[in-house]
């Protein structure tokens, strides 16, 4: 059976003749049965039944209609008592089928919790130890100890904004006074350290001692001067070395050192000598090529040498640095500069540099073209002596010619690289010697 919603709204009785306010709960109605018309188009709504008067009420004009129950705003859920009717105010009859309004419970707002006091957040109070006196607590500890005995009213008074601001200012003043005292102590300590003749650093700040040697004790001497060389151009296959190979000797001047200490310094494996090429006067570094050439080095080969401790041709011990693999790309007159660096393994850290201990400059070296090259010289006694002791250096018999063109013909090319039995680059030395003998016989 279809039902319809009747929008008859009940209104609470007004006070003092004023119009009652609308109910916020929404529209209220009653379910009324309906019947259909014979044609089936529109439903016919049955009229509402007449209101039934309450029992015991008379038919006279003095009979008052029933009163509705007012909303009781009480925090409890039980319905409140009925409000007595006021004869002077207009009354509204209660419609049948409509129950009394449910009681509305107001929303209970939660009271915000009070922020804890400043003393609850404070950590353990600092203790000031002074010489000749016992430990003394700070003002914060005293305030926290006294705050436990105050009443709640006094505590609320202490938590007022004025008191908090004044206490914060007092704390700032205390911090400033502490900082000023610390800075005064630091400044007095720094002045005392400057005034003292010997200022000793604490053990944690002192650097660790490193076995570094004095740079003024080392000296370099060129024992074997370079004389001539053939320019090798910009290729890598037809390369000619400087003749004779430069040999540099390192000496140490230290009267207080014992012979064992001197041998230890001479055999130091981290002593390195670097070679660079300069102009004829020795004032300008010519390692870089001019702009019209390709970006290559002028001096090529092994530019760094390690120490070799042995005896020279006179039988004396020494520390030697040999450069048997040096070549020059362009012809001209140059000088070779040798720089000694003594590396200390204890100071090998990133960002540090090792100073140059000693330097030495060679005599003038002349680099010839292929046609003007006079030829190779025979190896010196010093070179042969070092070779016998195990030094990696080549031995040359040499074929120096005075007319030039030593490297032009095929025989000159063979003679300038004719090696004897001590040559490390050999392997074909005996064959070349046999060829040379056959050529001479013919």
From Swiss-Prot:
Keywords: Nucleus, Sporulation, Transcription, Transcription regulation, Virulence. InterPro entries: Velvet, Velvet_dom, Velvet_dom_sf. One of its GO terms (cellular component) is nucleus. One of its GO terms (biological process) is sporulation resulting in formation of a cellular spore. The gene is VELC. Residues 433-442 have a biased composition (Basic residues). Residues 213-396 form the Velvet domain. Residues 45-54 have a biased composition (Pro residues). Its main location: nucleus. Residues 79-97 have a biased composition (Low complexity). The keyword Nucleotide-binding does not apply. Disruption phenotype: Leads to reduced formation of conidia. Exhibits significantly reduced pathogenicity, developing only a few small necrotic lesions. This is Sexual development regulator VELC. Pfam families: Velvet. It is found in: Nucleus. Belongs to the velvet family. VelC subfamily. Velvet-domain-containing protein that acts as a positive regulator of sexual development. Plays an important role in pathogenicity through regulating positively appressorium-mediated penetration and invasive growth. The lineage of its organism: Eukaryota, Fungi, Dikarya, Ascomycota, Pezizomycotina. Residues 1-192, 396-442 are annotated as: Disordered. Residues 401-411 have a biased composition (Gly residues). It comes from the Eukaryota. The keyword Disulfide bond does not apply.
């Amino acid at each position: 059976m279809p039902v319809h919603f009747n929008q008859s709204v009940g209104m609470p009785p007004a006070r003092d003749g004023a119009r009652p306010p609308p109910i916020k709960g929404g529209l209220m109605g009653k379910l009324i049965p309906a019947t259909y018309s014979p044609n089936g188009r529109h439903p016919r709504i049955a009229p509402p039944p007449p209101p039934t008067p309450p029992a015991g009420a008379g038919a006279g004009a003095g009979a008052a209609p029933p009163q509705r129950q007012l909303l009781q705003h009480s925090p409890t859920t039980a319905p409140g008592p009925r409000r007595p009717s006021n004869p002077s105010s207009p009354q509204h009859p209660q419609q049948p089928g409509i129950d009394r309004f449910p009681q509305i419970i107001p929303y209970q707002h939660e009271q915000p919790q009070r922020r804890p006091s400043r003393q609850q957040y404070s950590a353990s109070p600092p203790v000031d130890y002074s010489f000749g006196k016992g430990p003394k607590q700070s003002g914060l500890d005293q305030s926290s100890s006294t705050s436990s005995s105050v009443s709640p009213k006094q505590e609320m008074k202490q938590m007022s904004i004025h008191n908090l601001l004044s206490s914060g200012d007092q704390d700032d003043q205390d911090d400033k006074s502490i900082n000023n005292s610390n800075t005064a102590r630091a400044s007095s300590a720094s002045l005392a350290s400057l005034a003292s003749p010997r200022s000793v650093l604490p053990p944690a700040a002192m650097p660790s001692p490193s076995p570094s040697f004095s740079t003024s004790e080392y000296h370099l001497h060129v024992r074997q001067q370079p004389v001539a060389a053939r320019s090798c151009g910009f290729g890598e296959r037809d390369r000619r070395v400087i003749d004779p190979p430069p040999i540099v000797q390192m000496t140490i001047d230290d009267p207080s050192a014992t012979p064992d200490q001197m041998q230890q310094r001479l055999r130091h494996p981290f002593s390195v000598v670097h070679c660079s090429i300069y102009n004829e006067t020795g004032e300008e570094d010519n390692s870089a090529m001019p702009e019209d050439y390709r970006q290559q080095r002028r001096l090529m080969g092994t530019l760094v040498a390690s120490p070799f401790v042995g005896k020279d041709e006179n039988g004396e011990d020494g520390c030697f640095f040999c450069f048997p693999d040096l070549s020059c790309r362009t012809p001209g007159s140059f000088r070779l500069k040798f720089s000694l660096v003594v590396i200390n393994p204890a100071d090998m850290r990133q960002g540090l540099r090792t100073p140059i201990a000693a330097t030495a400059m060679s005599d003038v070296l002349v680099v010839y073209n292929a046609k003007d090259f006079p030829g190779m010289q025979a190896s010196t006694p010093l070179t042969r002596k070092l070779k016998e002791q195990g030094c990696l250096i080549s031995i040359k018999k040499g074929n120096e010619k005075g007319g030039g063109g030593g490297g032009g013909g095929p025989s000159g090319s063979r003679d300038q690289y004719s090696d004897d039995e001590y040559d490390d680059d050999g392997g074909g030395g005996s064959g070349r010697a046999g060829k040379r003998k056959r050529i001479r016989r013919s």
